[in-house]
From Swiss-Prot:
Pfam families: Ribosomal_L2, Ribosomal_L2_C. Part of the 50S ribosomal subunit. Forms a bridge to the 30S subunit in the 70S ribosome. SUPFAM superfamilies: Nucleic acid-binding proteins (SSF50249), Translation proteins SH3-like domain (SSF50104). This is Large ribosomal subunit protein uL2. It comes from Streptococcus uberis (strain ATCC BAA-854 / 0140J). NCBIfam families: rplB_bact. The keyword rRNA-binding applies. GO terms for cellular component: large ribosomal subunit. Residues 218-277 are annotated as: Disordered. The gene is rplB. The keyword Repressor does not apply.
């Protein structure tokens, strides 16, 4: 998928780019796989903001994605490659030979008419899903399960990929996109190939209004707020923070504080941290 560059007809259009959507084969989604999606604008059930900078944006339907890929030994044909407003990756509509329809994350190189299959004996081909223990060392994978049968949780964003490094007993060593190397149970499933739409990260938004279409609201600096709104607020003119270190709006240390649970049981499964050189 290529990048479309706009002419600088206005200040907002200057340097603006977008995807050309050349890979998209249809603009009409499969109706049976759509679910209504209510705009919560970052609020919880008490009406309080729990996620800032969310609200507005275009109405969307949620596309039900098959992250489990547990329909073993039933072949499916790729019918369409579609845009999904709820994620950076594109999705593919597949029709199984038994009549079931499903959406999957569209890997790079997947084409309409291609046949895919899931199961322990599936071939190592783009779009096929199988247990990690059955995938050869060096294979590029995505949509990786953390727990058997739960569905893919890792490596689902546009352009993301991971690689199988080896096997130790019942665990498989996987290098993730961040550089982290961790052990995952060999019975967990993954899909062959990297996620498509890899040029999505190169798009220049160009103007604030385009982010508002996506439901992203402005981010305001704490230093320009009032002292009752943010620890950095108040003072006369451009005042400094007034603390030992920058803080979050809730008074906790910002910039570099480790938030991971020090007693996390999964620590023993992480062989190499993402920030280790």
């Amino acid at each position: 998928m290529g990048i479309k560059v706009y002419k600088p007809t206005t200040n907002g259009r200057r340097n603006m780019t977008s995807l050309d959507f050349a890979e998209i084969t249809t603009s009409t989604p499969e109706k049976s796989l759509l679910v209504s999606l209510k705009n919560k604008a970052g609020r919880n059930n008490n009406g309080r903001i729990t996620v800032r900078h969310q609200g507005g944006g275009h109405k969307r339907h949620y596309r039900v994605i098959d992250f489990k890929r547990n329909k073993d030994n039933v072949e499916a044909v790729v019918k369409t490659i579609e845009y999904d407003p709820n994620r950076t990756a594109n999705i593919a509509l597949v029709h199984y030979t038994d009549g079931v329809k499903a959406y999957i994350i569209a890997p790079k190189g997947l084409e309409v008419g291609q046949r895919i299959i899931s199961g322990p004996e599936a071939d190592i081909k783009i779009g096929n899903a199988l247990p990690l223990a059955n995938i050869p060392v060096g294979t590029v994978i995505h949509n990786i399960e953390m727990k058997p049968g739960k569905g893919g949780e890792l490596v689902r964003a546009a352009g993301a990929s991971a690689q199988v490094l080896g096997q130790e007993g019942k665990y498989v060593l996987v290098r993730l996109q961040s550089g982290e190397v961790r052990m995952i149970l060999g019975t967990c499933r993954a899909t062959i190939g990297s996620v498509g739409n890899e040029q999505q990260s190169l798009v220049n938004i160009g103007k604030a209004g385009r982010n508002r279409w996506k439901g992203v609201r402005p981010t305001v600096r704490g230093s320009v707020m009032n002292p009752n709104d943010h620890p950095h607020g108040g003072g006369e003119g451009k005042a400094p923070v007034g603390r030992k270190a920058p803080s979050t709006p809730w008074g906790k240390p910002a910039l570099g504080l480790k938030t991971r649970n020090k007693k996390a049981k999964s620590d023993k499964l992480i062989i190499r941290r993402r920030n280790e050189k």
